[in-house]
Amino acid sequence: MTILGTALTPKATKVMLLGSGELGKEVVIELQRLGVEVIAVDRYENAPAQQVAHRSYTISMLDGNALKALIEKEKPDYIVPEVEAIATSTLVELEQAGFNVVPTAKATQLTMNREGIRRLAAEKLKLPTSNYQFVDNFDDFQSAVENLGIPCVIKPIMSSSGHGQSILKSKDDLQKAWDYAQQGGRAGAGRVIVEGFVKFDYEITLLTVRHAEGTSFLAPIGHRQEKGDYRESWQPQAMSVQALAKAQHIAEKITTELGGRGIFGVEMFVCGDEVIFNEVSPRPHDTGMVTLISQELSEFALHARAILGLPIPEINLISPAASKAIVVEGKSNQVQFGNLFEVLQEPNTNIRLFGKGEVNGHRRLGVILARDISVDKALEKVSRAYDKLDIQL
């Protein structure tokens, strides 16, 4: 039997969020709807989830001593990592001491870098993946490109939202691709994965929930990327019966190996009836923001339920839907959004503005959401709304 305490009382159920971006913000809101006390942590002040949490702290989460001291001070019932750049060895140590890491410290440690999860998927679980090599220096990088061929995909082993990722299309860009990967790593310069290019019809995120009563799958989400960063997503993505069955098999196999409870974003490439594993995140996925409007329970609500041991009897899709990321480039600490009346004029259209106070280069500041009678109609609707938005830096 699950018993939840009330926030800000001696018997409160406490969750500490490690990473406080826009996805974490939605998780905080869903936890607070269930009366949970939430502490949000990030490396910079006033991050989106910190703005809505009961308390917040700003530390380097790669500093194991600082992280351990904070967790021992707050003594949360659940520790919920929301980013990759965390001292995961400290989480392993704290889990062994009795703290509850969501979904598990092992899952957080393996998925924080692409090497751990790729070796688990391809070498231990024998899941279909692209060809790949890991490299530590420019000479080995050149050799890997020679072996895998051009085009190929270059990624830091630890990064998110497309940072440091590129598709190498010419040998003339070798140095540029290497330098970009070195600059984009969440923990600084270092090891890189070079992946053989996969020919695919489309990419999907299969959100997979491990909960008290088993494993459940959301309707597959299609998405479009630019420079490794999500720009649009839609649900459901049409798939053959065979491809969907293979995708669910892959997702169940990898999430079972990682263990614990919570939502996982399993990314895959699909070509006809064939499915190739790409990556997995043990947390809500940015492409899954479409579920804020497409489903009765969003990925964030499902994550909260799973963490707390609450039932998930079924997952209902309300209608086809789409999302479009609001991405800006420039420099400002006083961003404003205009024409919102026009943006929200059409029925079943919504917007989420993340509350990120500063732009210095390229940053995702919000998302536009819409439902319609088909995915194509929903994509057209979010594009129309996006075109009306006036962003002032």
Swiss-Prot record:
Enzyme class: ligase
GO molecular function: ATP binding; magnesium ion binding; phosphoribosylglycinamide formyltransferase 2 activity; phosphoribosylglycinamide formyltransferase activity
GO CC annotations on file: cytosol
Any one biological process term the GO annotation gives: 'de novo' IMP biosynthetic process
Binding site residues for ATP: 114, 155, 160-165, 195-198, 203
Pathway this chain belongs to: Purine metabolism; IMP biosynthesis via de novo pathway; N(2)-formyl-N(1)-(5-phospho-D-ribosyl)glycinamide from N(1)-(5-phospho-D-ribosyl)glycinamide (formate route): step 1/1
Pfam families linked to this entry: ATP-grasp (PF02222), PurT_C (PF21244), RS_preATP-grasp-like (PF22660)
Domain ATP-grasp positions: 119-308
Gene3D superfamilies: 3.40.50.20, ATP-grasp fold, A domain, ATP-grasp fold, B domain
Catalytically driven reaction(s): N(1)-(5-phospho-beta-D-ribosyl)glycinamide + formate + ATP = N(2)-formyl-N(1)-(5-phospho-beta-D-ribosyl)glycinamide + ADP + phosphate + H(+)
Enzyme Commission code(s) on record: 6.3.1.21
Keyword match Nucleotide-binding: yes
Residues the entry annotates as binding N(1)-(5-phospho-beta-D-ribosyl)glycinamide: 22-23, 82, 286, 356, 363-364
Keywords of the record: ATP-binding, Ligase, Magnesium, Metal-binding, Nucleotide-binding, Purine biosynthesis
Amino acids binding Mg(2+): 267, 279
Record InterPro entries: ATP-grasp, ATP-grasp_carboxylate-amine, ATP_grasp_subdomain_1, PreATP-grasp_dom_sf, PurT, PurT/PurK_preATP-grasp, PurT_C, Rudment_hybrid_motif
Function according to Swiss-Prot or TrEMBL: Involved in the de novo purine biosynthesis. Catalyzes the transfer of formate to 5-phospho-ribosyl-glycinamide (GAR), producing 5-phospho-ribosyl-N-formylglycinamide (FGAR). Formate is provided by PurU via hydrolysis of 10-formyl-tetrahydrofolate.
Subunit structure, interactors included: Homodimer.
Family: Belongs to the PurK/PurT family.
Protein name, as recorded: Formate-dependent phosphoribosylglycinamide formyltransferase
Organism, as annotated: Histophilus somni (strain 129Pt) (Haemophilus somnus)
